[in-house]
Amino acid sequence: MIRGRKRDGTVHARPDVCLSSMDDFFLRKPPAMDESPRLRPLSRAEARNLDLRAVRELGLPTLVLMENAGRSAARWFLEDWLSQGKGNLTDHKVLILCGPGSNGGDGGVMARWLDLAGVLVRVAWVSGPVPRLPAGDAAIQRDALAKAGFDQQDWVLPEDNAKLAKSLSWCTWVVDALLGTGLTRPIDGAFRTAVEMINDSGKPVYALDLPSGLDADTGEPLGVALRATATATFVAPKLACQYKEAEEYLGEVAVLPIGLPYALLEDYIEED
């Protein structure tokens, strides 16, 4: 019997979910990379183009891709990180920092899966210095979490830096779903301060797609970048992953599938 958490943080038995293994929880394990085509590192533009092709050529809604990404990220996080060492999943408190774009939406999906596994989750939708709520698919994720009663907050930096500091003291892990691969300009101002606060906290960071602030093409920090313990990058490695200088920001990297078929991937298969 799975043990989960109520919204007040107390642990309770969940008789409606009886699981013999994590495989049962996720129904079917996503294919390991050694069982799937090995793809060469992709540029920021190539990764974006793959998503667009999935929508235009296959008719896949972007919300489906987001759901698949968040689910894959939650699985690796639960199996290879939260389940390691002593203690139970319910001993962890995970702070998921979401930006207003699709990377934040991936974090919103991940929050639901972690909650289902019994992990205590706090979600913060972060913007600043001008307030900006999530749009599109990310807004759908935010609304779903709100209706499900999640511990969910809207932060505008730098005004809410104190909330960030308090949550960093509270959590055992930080999930970085702030900026993803689309960033092209240096991080400055309020977001730079936030990145520095997270790095200085010493809390392990699990980054979605790429650590916030790391240039997807060059592997260099755009002013400043989060130093992740682990990075879950989707579909294929990004160009940044091939540079030794980026290792201190990436941590351990896993390439996770989001359900794109071979027909879309064959042009990017790495040659022997």
Curated annotation (Swiss-Prot):
Protein origin, superkingdom: Bacteria
Cofactor annotation: K(+)
Keywords from the UniProt entry: Isomerase, Metal-binding, NAD, NADP, Nucleotide-binding, Potassium
Record-listed E.C. numbers: 5.1.99.6
Enzyme's top EC category: isomerase
Protein family (similarity comment): Belongs to the NnrE/AIBP family.
Entry protein name: NAD(P)H-hydrate epimerase
Native source species: Isosphaera pallida (strain ATCC 43644 / DSM 9630 / IS1B)
